[in-house]
């Protein structure tokens, strides 16, 4: 880890059930899929869905648009 980078104490862990308390997805709930303690963010299942444009590859020659969860700040979620 880089020097000078401070880990934030995150009050939730992976597989915890949380509810979003602020932002566009306020009121939604889901399971924590991943925690980023250095950034103080968490990825919650079904929350903060964004579309990603994937470039063409050999397996999908036309490319595709996929929807996936993006991180939300840990202060915007609560357990329960």
Swiss-Prot record:
Superkingdom of origin organism: Bacteria
Keyword set, alphabetical order: Ribonucleoprotein, Ribosomal protein, RNA-binding, rRNA-binding
InterPro entries with a match to the protein in the record: KOW (IPR005824), Rib_uL2_dom2 (IPR014722), Ribosomal_uL24 (IPR003256), Ribosomal_uL24_CS (IPR005825), Ribosomal_uL24_KOW (IPR041988), Translation_prot_SH3-like_sf (IPR008991)
HAMAP family (alphabetical): Ribosomal_uL24_B
SMART domains linked: KOW
Claim: RNA-binding is one of the keywords in the record: yes
GO annotation, cellular component aspect: ribonucleoprotein complex; ribosome
Protein name per its UniProtKB record: Large ribosomal subunit protein uL24
Family the UniProt entry places it in: Belongs to the universal ribosomal protein uL24 family.
GO biological process: translation
Pfam family, one: ribosomal_L24
Any one GO MF annotation of this record: structural constituent of ribosome
Quaternary assembly: Part of the 50S ribosomal subunit.
PANTHER family linked: MITOCHONDRIAL RIBOSOMAL PROTEIN L24
Role according to the record: One of two assembly initiator proteins, it binds directly to the 5'-end of the 23S rRNA, where it nucleates assembly of the 50S subunit. One of the proteins that surrounds the polypeptide exit tunnel on the outside of the subunit.
Coiled-coil portions: none
SUPFAM superfamilies named in the record: Translation proteins SH3-like domain (SSF50104)
